[in-house]
Amino acid sequence: MGIRLLKMHGYDVDPNALKHFKQEDGKFSCYGGQMIESASPIYNLYRASQLRFPGEEILEEATKFAYNFLQEKIANNQIQEKWVISEHLIDEIKLGLKMPWYATLPRVEAAYYLQYYAGTGDVWIGKTFYRMPEISNDTYKELAVLDFNRCQAQHQFEWIYMQEWYQSSSVKAFGISKKELLLAYFLAAATIFEPERTQERIMWAKTQIVSRMIKSFLSKENTLSLEQKTTLLIDFGHDINGLNKINSVEKGNGLAGTLLTTFQQLLEEFDRYTTHQLKNAWSQWFVKLQQGEGDGGADAELLANTLNICAGHIAFNEDILSHRDYTTLSSLTTKICQRLTQIQDKKILEIKDGSIKDKELEEEMQALVKLVLEENGGGIDRNIKQTFLSVFKTFYYCAYHHAETTDAHIFKVLFEPVV
């Protein structure tokens, strides 16, 4: 886990250090020559090996070994452990195998971790031998529970507001259900959960819903003719204020006025400079929509740009948007999320040995993770890069999990208090 933690915080770590734990028969072991291999070290190996960059073959080998080892032990009811006595260890391992790192969201992971964290109810040999009170600590657990429930209360308050917005903006008239709104807000809250980031969460959810409202409006046969739709998209791409032309094109259509009002309110929640930046982001999206690329990748690009703008990462420094690192991240995120959207629509995500079978997609995801996590002097701010990773992971999450699993996560993160 030390390798994983260091990599996640930007340190240059050679994963070949794991070769010291690889035996001649290709298996990995905490100590060579053991009669019984414990589950917890192999589970930690599995968690660490998922965070890999292109070309790190030792981590790919470790992932396959650890995944198959743990699956076999669970199937045969042979989970054995000599380092810790924990009632929930097997539950934690089962969850980790079902929900790999790419398919986790921060608050989902936290909710389950708190569920399985037993505090002093767990017995660690290392804690007893070396007097490490910070391990399995009841005080830490109490603090974590209070923090989680405080954030959850804030999220519930915001969800009430989002439902009011849904009604006042007549979102249902565009064929968008309240459950879709809940999913959009959940993805935001499970990713950027801190209480002080309300504006970013709300903007995340609204951006996803408003973009769907626009696409729904343009796809309705009884709203505009094909020629009018084409003209409208061109106007949007060149001048976001061209949205007013909806009224002149189709004054008698009630949806047009509703859409116009909702879109303008979305942009007017910010100061003039931020609004200008948001208009530019939407203009790019409208151009993609005109070119028939308005799903998946373009949505991810719009969302990432919007979040970076709203968080103030680009304030008074629009040159960042044309920085080589930013454009590379944006292009790669767009390409990956476009593919993930296609996978989600067709339900064709195939998993083998804990990894997806689409090797090209997997390599692109590894490249994105490397660009985000590795420090490169003179590059863009780490928070900006992290935004692209956060957006990508929500797309992977939606492609990976079934609706029933997502519903369970929504309830656990937003509505079930931790005790």
From Swiss-Prot:
EC number: 5.5.1.12
Chain positions recorded as substrate binding sites: K82
EC top class, as a word: isomerase
InterPro entries in the record: Isoprenoid_synthase_dom_sf, Terpene_synth_N, Terpene_synth_N_sf, Terpene_synthase-like, Terpenoid_cyclase/PrenylTrfase
Tissue and organ distribution: Ubiquitous expression in roots, stems, leaves and flowers.
Required cofactor names: Mg(2+)
Note: Abietane diterpenoids (e.g. miltiradiene, abietatriene and ferruginol) accumulate specifically in the periderm of roots. The ent-kaurene diterpenoid oridonin, main constituent of Isodon rubescens, accumulates in leaves.
Official protein name in the record: Copalyl diphosphate synthase 2, chloroplastic
